[in-house]
Amino acid sequence: MESKDWVAGISKSDAGRYSRQLLVDDFGVSGQKNLKNTAVLIVGAGGLGCPVATYLGAAGVGTLGIVDYDRISLDNLHRQVAYKEDQVGQSKSQGLADNVKLQNSGVTTVVHNVSLDSSNAMEIFKNYDIVCDCTDNVATRYLINDVCVLLNIPLVSGSALRWDGQLSVYHYGPDCPCYRCLFPSPPDPSSVTNCNEGGVLGPIVGTIGSMQALEVMKIAAKLSTTLAGKLLLFDGREGKSRTIRLRKRDPKCAVCGDEPSITAPIDYMLFCGAGAHDKIENLKLLEPSVRVNVHEYQEIRSAARKQFLLDTRPPVEFEIAHLPEAIDITLNECRSLQAEELSSRLGVDSQTSDVYVICHRGNDSQRAVKLLKEKLGSIHFRDIIGGYEEWALKINDEFPLY
Amino acid sequence: MVSVKVLFFGEAFQLVGKREETVEFPAETDYEELRRIILEKYPALSKIEKVMMLAVDQEYANPGDRFELERFTEIAVIPPLSGG
């Protein structure tokens, strides 16, 4: 035997670079080699997508595809930690792929700078072994689920809002349910809160995204201890997590059941009654006669001696900024309080004829006007179109946009 | 009847305004009755009725399942989160 002979399980450069994870039981050389041969698709380059991409790139995944049509904005940066201030306005999918490549040049990155929909999802997904759902809306979650089932790809699904996170692996193994087995019909769109409205803390998406990356590494390494068939609930406020054992695959499931009715992607906006994004919808619930724009309200408040303005936003938003005359009565309180309580909170009496209603962007204020008209019929309630956001854009650019 | 802890996650917490509360249930019951009692006691949850999962002692409850509840049983009300 020559002194230069040896048996290599892994290249010298990979052994050096990944030594600390090669040393971990049950991952080791075979896990590393499998990870290098795995192509992972991340849908959504936001608060979840950033840690998923960053950790998988660093760990040496073979190919990382990133789907996102959106651009980086300043209010993303508190949680989407892969992006820098000078990247605001740039493509998220490109920015995240660049970041991964900078950290580990050995990873192949594929940028899908598109809005994922029924027409392109099959074509994009078919080249990947594992998909991560890091999206922010219900319609896209059903689309991703269905396409993963149709192409038989395991799905690592994370989600987060406020202080809470959820994590599961769908469609991985014969008994494992898919998202549709658990939620055959979509939620009522009015009951869905997204991060733009409800907010979310960076470390919550950071925790869930990091755990998604870990699930991908376990699937790639062919470990049997994944979250398939289980749902992890993370409560960051209490520092607690619980793992729920889920149902088995539903034989009657519309997509992964024994006789599926869905055999190709469907129209998910129609199915969910909501768009495939987390942007705020502009509702028109009221007649123009019960609405004023911000310019009209500015004239009204400068002409009147005392103006009644009801602010429907939750206390955390009221605290960010409000007009001095605003009285905080939330939309929920408009719903639950009796007429007398509402009158006394507002400080109105039998002489009061006009009350204006304002919220963040002009949707809840319309809902509130409808509720208030029922309870206090003698008062003329009108909402301010576009809310404080419009006020900040058109009347007072010092007013905080959030 | 037996007093059992009910936990509210995510949007269920937002709607009910409490993280947990003790609720009386018949000791022998089933999935349908659990749902009915919870929705009657917390009508605000009707908003998420279509997507509301129940888990009894950390195990997903299926329609038709029967339960024998005990003092330390925990029932979780879990709607999906969709943000990210």
Swiss-Prot record, chain A:
<dbReference type="Pfam" id="PF00581">
    <property type="entry name" value="Rhodanese"/>
</dbReference>
<dbReference type="InterPro" id="IPR001763">
    <property type="entry name" value="Rhodanese-like_dom"/>
</dbReference>
<dbReference type="InterPro" id="IPR035985">
    <property type="entry name" value="Ubiquitin-activating_enz"/>
</dbReference>
<comment type="function">
    <text>Plays a central role in 2-thiolation of mcm(5)S(2)U at tRNA wobble positions of cytosolic tRNA(Lys), tRNA(Glu) and tRNA(Gln). Also essential during biosynthesis of the molybdenum cofactor. Acts by mediating the C-terminal thiocarboxylation of sulfur carriers URM1 and MOCS2A. Its N-terminus first activates URM1 and MOCS2A as acyl-adenylates (-COAMP), then the persulfide sulfur on the catalytic cysteine is transferred to URM1 and MOCS2A to form thiocarboxylation (-COSH) of their C-terminus.</text>
</comment>
<dbReference type="GO" id="GO:0005829">
    <property type="term" value="C:cytosol"/>
</dbReference>
<feature type="binding site">
    <location>
        <position position="181"/>
    </location>
    <ligand>
        <name>Zn(2+)</name>
    </ligand>
</feature>
<keyword id="KW-0501">Molybdenum cofactor biosynthesis</keyword>
<dbReference type="GO" id="GO:0061604">
    <property type="term" value="F:molybdopterin-synthase sulfurtransferase activity"/>
</dbReference>
<dbReference type="GO" id="GO:0061605">
    <property type="term" value="F:molybdopterin-synthase adenylyltransferase activity"/>
</dbReference>
<dbReference type="GO" id="GO:0006777">
    <property type="term" value="P:Mo-molybdopterin cofactor biosynthetic process"/>
</dbReference>
<keyword id="KW-0548">Nucleotidyltransferase</keyword>
<dbReference type="InterPro" id="IPR045886">
    <property type="entry name" value="ThiF/MoeB/HesA"/>
</dbReference>
<feature type="binding site">
    <location>
        <position position="256"/>
    </location>
    <ligand>
        <name>Zn(2+)</name>
    </ligand>
</feature>
<feature type="binding site">
    <location>
        <begin position="136"/>
        <end position="137"/>
    </location>
    <ligand>
        <name>ATP</name>
    </ligand>
</feature>
<keyword id="KW-0819">tRNA processing</keyword>
<dbReference type="InterPro" id="IPR036873">
    <property type="entry name" value="Rhodanese-like_dom_sf"/>
</dbReference>
<dbReference type="GO" id="GO:0005737">
    <property type="term" value="C:cytoplasm"/>
</dbReference>
<feature type="active site" description="Cysteine persulfide intermediate; for sulfurtransferase activity">
    <location>
        <position position="359"/>
    </location>
</feature>
<feature type="binding site">
    <location>
        <position position="68"/>
    </location>
    <ligand>
        <name>ATP</name>
    </ligand>
</feature>
<keyword id="KW-0547">Nucleotide-binding</keyword>
<feature type="active site" description="Glycyl thioester intermediate; for adenylyltransferase activity">
    <location>
        <position position="195"/>
    </location>
</feature>
<dbReference type="GO" id="GO:0046872">
    <property type="term" value="F:metal ion binding"/>
</dbReference>
From Swiss-Prot, chain B:
<dbReference type="GO" id="GO:0000166">
    <property type="term" value="F:nucleotide binding"/>
</dbReference>
<keyword id="KW-0963">Cytoplasm</keyword>
<comment type="subunit">
    <text>Heterotetramer; composed of 2 small (MOCS2A) and 2 large (MOCS2B) subunits.</text>
</comment>
<protein>
    <recommendedName>
        <fullName>Molybdopterin synthase sulfur carrier subunit</fullName>
    </recommendedName>
</protein>
<dbReference type="GO" id="GO:0030366">
    <property type="term" value="F:molybdopterin synthase activity"/>
</dbReference>
<keyword id="KW-0501">Molybdenum cofactor biosynthesis</keyword>
<keyword id="KW-0547">Nucleotide-binding</keyword>
<dbReference type="GO" id="GO:1990140">
    <property type="term" value="C:molybdopterin synthase complex"/>
</dbReference>
<dbReference type="InterPro" id="IPR012675">
    <property type="entry name" value="Beta-grasp_dom_sf"/>
</dbReference>
<dbReference type="Pfam" id="PF02597">
    <property type="entry name" value="ThiS"/>
</dbReference>
<feature type="modified residue" description="Glycyl adenylate; alternate">
    <location>
        <position position="84"/>
    </location>
</feature>
<dbReference type="InterPro" id="IPR003749">
    <property type="entry name" value="ThiS/MoaD-like"/>
</dbReference>
<dbReference type="InterPro" id="IPR044672">
    <property type="entry name" value="MOCS2A"/>
</dbReference>
<keyword id="KW-0597">Phosphoprotein</keyword>
<dbReference type="InterPro" id="IPR028887">
    <property type="entry name" value="MOCS2A_euk"/>
</dbReference>
<dbReference type="InterPro" id="IPR016155">
    <property type="entry name" value="Mopterin_synth/thiamin_S_b"/>
</dbReference>
<comment type="pathway">
    <text>Cofactor biosynthesis; molybdopterin biosynthesis.</text>
</comment>
<feature type="modified residue" description="1-thioglycine; alternate">
    <location>
        <position position="84"/>
    </location>
</feature>
<dbReference type="GO" id="GO:0006777">
    <property type="term" value="P:Mo-molybdopterin cofactor biosynthetic process"/>
</dbReference>
<dbReference type="GO" id="GO:0005829">
    <property type="term" value="C:cytosol"/>
</dbReference>
<comment type="similarity">
    <text>Belongs to the MoaD family. MOCS2A subfamily.</text>
</comment>
<dbReference type="GO" id="GO:1990133">
    <property type="term" value="C:molybdopterin adenylyltransferase complex"/>
</dbReference>
